[in-house]
């Protein structure tokens, strides 16, 4: 059976409005629609980099005590955590470039 969900721990963590820190989460493998749907979003049309925010909010199934990881949550991550999640996403989905021999 193929593994479709992967646990992660953010370097710093998401600090919510109540001061709670959320570091551990789960990301599922991406499907084609996870990368297609954001392209229809007006925020992505005006700023293509925003696709990353939407894609991550679609594939992170939970983060700490949060069951709903919205684009607003991703927008409020520390930069190092966003970078970590982008690398984690590429790694679990087999999108990392391999070194040439």
Positions of predicted regions on the chain:
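Short, surface-exposed, charged amphipathic helix/loop patches that serve as local interaction elements
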Residues: 1-101
